[in-house]
Design a protein with these regions (language model features):
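Bacterial Sec-dependent N-terminal signal peptides
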Residues: 1-21
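Repetitive, compositionally biased segments used for assembly/scaffolding
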Residues: 17-110
Length: 110
């Protein structure tokens, strides 16, 4: 029984870590094309850049940037043109500020 609980814990504990994001240089290899807006009110998602990949998260905008695309949960491409983006981001200073403003786009990062 303890073994089963341990296995379940290992499987589901990964769901609570910050999202590992890889920034691609080509739009065609990205899962999501994003644009960074200048004002918070323009954003679909407010993102906090975590320094810790094990920071609790449930698709709430806490991102940890990785150097390898194979360890990433999602690959994003930062575009310079807002009209090309499927998701508009605003980077926040504090973790508690992170979160979705347009929840209809949450599926993009699952």
């Amino acid at each position: 029984m303890n073994y089963l609980l341990f296995i379940l814990h290992c499987l589901f504990s990964g769901l609570s870590f910050s999202q590992k994001i890889f920034s691609t240089k080509e739009a065609y290899s990205a899962d999501v094309i994003v644009f960074v807006v200048k004002n918070e009110y323009q954003a679909d998602l407010k993102v906090f850049k975590s320094k810790n990949q094990f920071q609790p998260n449930q698709n709430k905008g806490i991102w940890y940037f990785v150097d390898n695309q194979y360890t990433a949960d999602k690959k994003v491409y930062f575009t310079e043109n807002q009209y090309q983006a499927t998701l508009k981001l605003f980077f926040v200073e504090y973790e508690y500020q992170a979160g979705w403003k347009d929840k209809s786009k949450m599926h993009l990062l699952y």
